[in-house]
């Protein structure tokens, strides 16, 4: 399979730079996986699409203000993007600079350069940085960090993004990108879903900056997926098994929930799914056998991204590309602050040939 098979034309004007005034007021394109049929509506239509007893799976990670600006003590501006917090004093990060800092280099971080840190080691493209400060990494980031808006949102972050680029149920700090399908859920909608009898449970996957890395190979099978930490606790496993047992659906909110659930299923020894607390490098593309997820709520993804490949593996390649073509024609808003899709699983997707 070639990366270019997942390309599509997207006018710049369809990239959303701000969210809708109300979280749940975005548009919703529904794709019936088995038939490919499309339905246009609004996000609150989910209420009619979900049945009592269906299980909604959310990712409760919380975005940290992961972008820092500053300079090397020896001169030279730098930009630091946290990939993950290692402990209370250390981070693993991407560093942009005209010349990469060497181990032992002193860094002055923050818009006022008030925070002192040391680059202690390099691991491939990533740098280990230790803060020389009494406060914890999280306190420092909350104090001097900027919200790490994706590269395609071409504007500086604003104070409002600290709330807008965060799900209302976010709980565990550690992500450097929001699980964006969840941004559309507000408290009134969650309340109505609960009242209808829809079950809810949470995984945690701390989205890394690698989620924005382009696929740099021509052939999909050659791509090496970035690693992210995921947690699928026992209560989540119990909720999945109970939903399946009563004939209800497991509905993943976002590709990060999909990757968490399917990672836990891949690692399971004795049951459909078992608790999972580990790094995952799961790469889902056409031909993948889904084991847990029956339906998916997701935003519109970048051309040639691993995420449009994941959706194609779920709904079928042709159905997915047709849906994206329709979304462009109907002027849906794309990417993190854009509109959403509701997709049901296509069991025939695994047999579909792509690019032939």
Curated annotation (Swiss-Prot):
Keyword Transferase: yes
Cellular component GO terms, alphabetical: cytoplasm
Keyword Transferase carried by entry: yes
One of the protein's GO biological processes: queuosine biosynthetic process
Domain of life the protein comes from: Bacteria
Cross-referenced NCBIfam families: PRK00147.1, queA
Protein name as annotated: S-adenosylmethionine:tRNA ribosyltransferase-isomerase
Species whose genome carries this gene: Shigella boydii serotype 18 (strain CDC 3083-94 / BS512)
Organism lineage string: Bacteria, Pseudomonadati, Pseudomonadota, Gammaproteobacteria, Enterobacterales
Gene name tied to this protein: queA
